[in-house]
Curated annotation (Swiss-Prot):
Residues 7-124 form the MATH domain. SMART domains: BTB, MATH. Pfam families: BTB (PF00651), MATH (PF00917). InterPro entries: BTB-MATH_domain_protein (IPR052664), BTB/POZ_dom (IPR000210), MATH/TRAF_dom (IPR002083), SKP1/BTB/POZ_sf (IPR011333), TRAF-like (IPR008974). PANTHER family: BTB AND MATH DOMAIN CONTAINING-RELATED, MEPRIN/TRAF-LIKE MATH FAMILY-C.ELEGANS. Keywords: Repeat. This is BTB and MATH domain-containing protein 45. Residues 148-215, 304-368 form the BTB domain. The keyword Repeat applies.
Amino acid sequence: MAAAHKVFELSHVFKDVSKIGDDESVCSPNEDYFGVPWKIVLRHKDEKMGVFLSCEKPSNNDAHCIVNVVYSVKLMSSSGVCYIKSDSKLFGEITEHGWVNFVNWNTMVDAFLIDDSIIIEVLVKTIFMSGLPKKSPKNFDESNKEFSDGIVVVKHQNFHILKKFLAFHCEYLEKLFFGDFKEAGKAEVTLKAISSTDFHYLLAVLYEDYAIDDDNVGGILRLASYLQVPIVIRKCEQFLIEGSGKPMEIRLDIAEKECLQNLKKHCLSKVGTADQIEAARAILPSDIPKRALKKFDESNKEFSDVIFVVEHNKFYVLKQILASHSSHFKKIFVENVDKREFTLADIDSNDFQNLVEVMYGVSFIDDLTVEGVLHLAHMYDRPFPMQKCVEFLIDLSEKSPKEKLKIAKAYQLKNLEKAALARINLPESIRAALSCDMAQMEVEVLKALMQKALFHLSDTKVHTETFF
């Protein structure tokens, strides 16, 4: 699978352009992506029109931020003429990149100025990001008490957890909580010789509340290997393959130490010699095996306290997992405290299986499952799975922009709509998007597509080069 590059688009109509004096600049409003404010800067200097992409350091972040991007700047006119320049730059100490002489000022006035206004569009694809602000991981202090039945103490820090949920993911903790250990049955257990920070991150990843990154992946992976938590090991490996900015040599070293065969194969294919690659192919699987469905049948009864019946299939699950992510199910459980079995009508059991897997953190959404999971997440008011579906559709899905626009309209997903529109730039993709029932399109979407189509009506392209 390709690396999960982030793509977004900035677009702004600059008005009263004739009033911009020499050596003056005007800016578009800041737009926040990945916790960083971005904007377009238009500058008039020495009869030249400069255009710059600005990536400012967040005011609440003291870390050294680095963002490597490829970007394409397009100056557009309603007559169909467009002028494009592209580049690849590293934002860090330097927060602004672009062209002092994007186009001659008089050329801009003659060819692009309409009603004293011009339209500038910037398409950005991130290659690597580091030091950006992160959201704090989920708290497992007393505020999480409602959704817990036990306490794990690490370095004098109390973590309020759900025993059956952790036991479901970790055989060691299953034995600790419910086996022959002296701690079994106790409300509070202590884990020694591990970092409380790493344990906090591991819990947050298990609860699907925190993203693995280059700063924490080492600690999370070591602890997941020590406690043998397969799903977290798998997620760390996937990040190191798809999203890490660490040098390949370092990732290969991690793969060797932690026996991550898919990561090892990936690294050797990037940096190894022909002999090394051939040797790796001989001992490693050619493809990542298709995952087996996680069973929520009677074999999971020990780690459940409620049953859902869907199309005659019984799913043994934990109330707290469903209630913690869905106000709909929380209300059902509150109103039916003593009820053990519930029936859900008019939904597909495969979709429910996929949804529960996402809630338990044992499945990665893909193009085959995303719409079913999204449908049920929307139906049962589950923001977390919806967020995961949107992230997948924006970052990893191979669905066409037309398909994504259709999904965005069905579930009112504005971020997905904007991301899909940003990827519609070639004439064939514009035609494909416009081939659907335009009467069903949102006015703003139709307007954006028609505007893009207009840019391609003219055969005149003053300059076109792009990395996209």
